[in-house]
Amino acid sequence: MASTQVVFIVTLFLYLLITRWRRKNEKSFIASEEPKQPEWRDYTPAELKEYNGSKNSLVFLAIKGTVYNVTMGSKFYGPQGPYSAFAGHDASRGLAKNSFDDEFIPDSDAEELDDCSDLNDEERQALNDWKAFFDQKYQAVGRLISPREARAAATISETEEKVAHN
């Protein structure tokens, strides 16, 4: 009879322990909100490179001029993921050619963006399919612009600011 009571007490204790642990985990899961999305903005390739998941917890990549926040897929695009080569870069050419080779990832210091105009029909279709996938799955957070475009936009802003103050 005493052994029945011991089994009952141990079972009750384990039940309470597990229930308390589950509630604690559920509360922390419920309390964690989806991270705030960055405001829409323009990114140069050098700026985009900062969002590769190593220096910054956010992971972005660009396809056909659109910058996507792929942080929620960081197990794929983050530092240890199979698509990590694309994190912080314009992934257009690599995805179109289904390749992770460095030769298909544009240099972040390049003055002009890769327009992918030399892709064949099959590669263009693959790129369009990837773009459609990213449009449905991930939040667009900006546009990829060339450093030349960024300098031109900065000059226009400075001119507008000077005119406004006069």
From Swiss-Prot:
Principal subcellular localisation of the protein: endoplasmic reticulum
Topology of this chain in the membrane: Single-pass membrane protein
GO cellular component assignments: endomembrane system; endoplasmic reticulum; endoplasmic reticulum membrane; membrane
Domain Cytochrome b5 heme-binding: 42-145
Gene3D superfamilies linked to this entry: Cytochrome b5-like heme/steroid binding domain (3.10.120.10)
Pfam families documented for this protein: Cyt-b5 (PF00173)
Repeat keyword on record: no
SS bond list: none
Signal peptide as annotated in the record: none
Disruption phenotype: Cells are viable under normal growth conditions, but contains a reduced amount of ergosterol and elevated amounts of the ergosterol biosynthetic intermediates, 24-methylene lanosterol, ergosta-5,7,24(28)-trienol and ergosta-5,7-dienol. Deletion mutant is sensitive to the inhibitors of sterol synthesis itraconazole and CoCl(2).
Subcellular location: Endoplasmic reticulum; Membrane
Family: Belongs to the cytochrome b5 family. MAPR subfamily.
Protein's name in the database: Cytochrome P450 regulator dap1
